[in-house]
Amino acid sequence: MLPAIEKVFRGLIKRQSLSLNDFAGIAVGFAAIIDSRTGRVLSTNGKYDDAKGMELAAWSRETFDLGLRIENDARMALLGESYGGAARGFSDVVMMTLGTGIGGVAMIEGKLLRGKHSQAGCLGGHLPVLFTGRPCTCGAIGCAEAEASGWALPGIVKDWPGASNSTLSKYANVGFKELFEQAAYGDAIATAIRDRCIAVWAADAVGLVHAYDPELIVIGGGVMESADVILPAIESHVQKHSWTPWGKVRVRAAELGNNAALLGAVPLLAEIF
């Protein structure tokens, strides 16, 4: 893996007519539990398992003579939204990313929550919302991700009563795009599954509010192409069911899309320079 990364990076530098002297450092967003202090990948949950245990910071210094920071990709996205997106100007924020999986990360008093073992505030998608629910890839039961994520959706549709009579049955591997489209066309099964997914996300959001006391929830990910349906429902549920005597938690859509984690590289690298 590392030789391939080096080849790609050097190729990018060459195409942009740059040199290593033009870089302050390297920032990497990775879908895993990360020890950002040492630059080690701690746990990957079946994704890129060969990265586990790699000393990327030491490799970067040896290969490029550049400092490297690696961080959980959802945390990187929150840093980006805080630096120049929907969370700019807020110090206490939770961000949910809804897509293939569910990310849930937290910033408290302007700093990412990491914790003693580097996994605080980055496993929001693995809060249990139904203890008798579906098995999750993490080993738990009824996690929000197991109940309403992209990887879980085909199984949810398959097990849904009457799904064979739904237009969803024509898709070999149904995704949220197809689900929301068919719900908009009036398919009753698609509508029921869509509404249940939104309810799961809303319940997860309330759990994150109670855990981290944010003033703002930012919601991003590919599913937010349907923000006009998702955002009002989650906001209504959060404001109705969150125990926040100080006032109401704001709920906003992410603004930066796939560029959020890229922009998050700026404040992440600023932590070491």
Question: How would you describe each model-predicted region?
Answer:
Residues 39-53:
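A charged helix-plus-loop insertion that forms the helical arch/lid used to bind
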Residues 88-147:
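Glycine-rich phosphate-binding loop of actin/hexokinase-like ATP-binding domains
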Residues 73, 99, 265:
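Active-site glycine-centered loops adjacent to acidic/histidine catalytic or metal-binding residues
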